[in-house]
Amino acid sequence: MNLALSDEQAMVRDMVRRFLADRYDATTMAKGPMSPDDWRALGELGLFALLTPEQAGGLGGGAAEVMIVSEEMGRALAITPLAEAILLCGRAIAGSAAAEEWGDRLMQGDALLAFAPGGALVDGRLRGSAAIVRDGMDAAAFVVETEAGALMLVDGQDSGVRRTPVRLVDGSMAAHVRFDAVQAQPLTVPAGMWAEAQALAGLSIVAELVGAMASLLDLTVDYVRQRHQFGKPIASFQVVQHRCARMYTWLEQSRSLLLKAALAEEEARVRAVTAARAYIGDAALKLAEEAVQLHGGMGVTDELAIGRGLRRVLLLSRLHGGGIAARAALAA
């Protein structure tokens, strides 16, 4: 197994890292969703085209590229719709007529698609609701997975679409979306491609978590070296050293599972991503909680990135059922 990045992959990592470093530091991390202008700028850099399948006009980047980009997003604690809008919805429309209408706009960052599981077709119209649709308030259209498992595309401007805003724990906005007899365009997605899309979205989430873990650990180590108690840096106390070492262990175990999932063969990727999700979400939450503890009361304030990072990790670790759902899937 080759764990080294290719020259092209290293260029992508460095590009994303520089872009985020210009916009985020410890005072701005996770202070709110990425602005539409910054999202479009990433599209102009070709990042979304890289992660979009060739059937939808993209460059067909694979799991390794998803891991690289998502980990950098997580390291900056950037709040973006990458997993759902690009990896799930971008693949849902690939190969269909919807790709002609939405593909370029999605890759350029000019339009946002949101994934909305819920609802049912009744007399050829979509009825029902989808709860907690991430970025649902800003979505131009919805990729809906009905209760029967069919994929449909719904125009967000349809008069039968009703949205109620919901603020999530990390400060980002979601929506409760109701579909009242709306027109829905069927999406024909090969079963293998949809399973791959779900795996890549899951991979993106755990990669974000690993990036966030690395950032929170770095911030914590810097803090305990600077914070003095009894005339010494608290980093000199053995109990603090042991706690930081435990955080590092959680990070490295998580990174190993992430690499295994990203480098798995396509037929084994779904299970490898599920195994990563079964561990990484819980490990990330423990690391974030430990980071808050080592910062003391300041760790839960908005002045420091640590508390905001905890809230971001809390959300990511619970998406799509989190570790509980992943462990249940492995046991099935």
Feature map (PLM): residue ranges:
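The feature captures the short pre-catalytic strand/loop hairpin that immediately precedes
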Residues: 190-195
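Flexible, small-/acidic-enriched active-site or ligand-binding loops
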Residues: 130-135, 156-186
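Short, glycine- and charge-enriched coil/turn segments that flank and shape catalytic ligand pockets
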Residues: 96-101, 125, 185-189, 266-270
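Alpha-helical interface subdomain recognition
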Residues: 1-76, 199-332
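Glycine-rich flavin
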Residues: 21-162, 331-332
